[in-house]
A protein has these predicted regions:
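Conserved Class I SAM-dependent methyltransferase catalytic core
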Residues: 117-163
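S-adenosyl-L-methionine
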Residues: 27-84
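Short, glycine/acidic-enriched loop or turn micro-motifs at the edges of active sites
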Residues: 8-10, 31, 71, 90-92, ...
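Glycine-rich, phosphate-binding/catalytic loops in enzymes
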Residues: 20-22, 101-105, 150-151
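Conserved SAM-binding loop of SAM-dependent methyltransferases across substrates and taxa
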Residues: 10-22
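Mobile active-site "lid"/loop adjacent to the S-adenosyl-L-methionine
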Residues: 89-120
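Conserved class I S-adenosyl-L-methionine
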Residues: 1-9
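Conserved acidic residues
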Residues: 1, 83, 130
């Protein structure tokens, strides 16, 4: 399915989806994060073109857009709306004393807090043709307090799936 990753970050989730064959549009609104991801894609493309055709095929399925995701989704024509919208909003700040991973600490400094994540879920539901998938910490409350149709749970994260009927 065609996936819109509305919270691209460093693109790791989008890369996994693209490696599974999904065309993915990644939307990132923070200019510094967008620049990091764009540079990473450029470097991967340059390296892959000389050595790895599989990597090139994956990268061809990935498109990067610098925009506010809600505004981007609202401007899509019906024929260009994705089957799936994927959201990975900044996880809530930890209550544990242990620090987050180094890359996430940098993200928290750049992004602070995703204060509009609840609204983004609503916009995503209006945009997605089939479903919205939200990645959350396993013990975090549901985004916007909205219970999903079903949940896929791992050791530390879960994926809340909201179906559009």
């Amino acid at each position: 399915p065609y996936v819109l990753d509305a919270t691209a970050g460093l693109g790791s989730d989008a890369f996994v989806l693209a490696s599974l064959g999904c065309p993915v549009t990644m939307v990132e609104r923070v200019p510094e994060v967008h620049a990091l991801l764009a540079d990473g894609l450029r470097v991967a493309g340059a390296w892959g073109s000389a050595k790895d055709q599989t990597l090139i095929a994956i990268l061809k399925r990935m498109t990067l857009v610098e925009s506010d995701a809600a505004k981007y989704m609202q401007t899509l024509e019906d024929t260009k709306k994705p089957e799936v919208v994927y959201l990975d909003p900044m996880f809530p700040l930890r209550t544990k004393s242990a620090q987050v991973k180094k890359e996430m600490h940098v993200f928290q400094q750049l992004i602070c807090k995703d204060v509009d994540a609840d609204l983004l879920l609503q916009t995503a539901q209006e945009c997605a043709q089939k479903r919205v998938v939200v990645k959350r910490p396993r013990i975090a409350p549901f985004l916007a307090g909205l219970e999903p149709n079903y949940t896929l749970e791992g050791r530390s994260n879960r994926y809340d799936v909201y179906l559009n009927h």
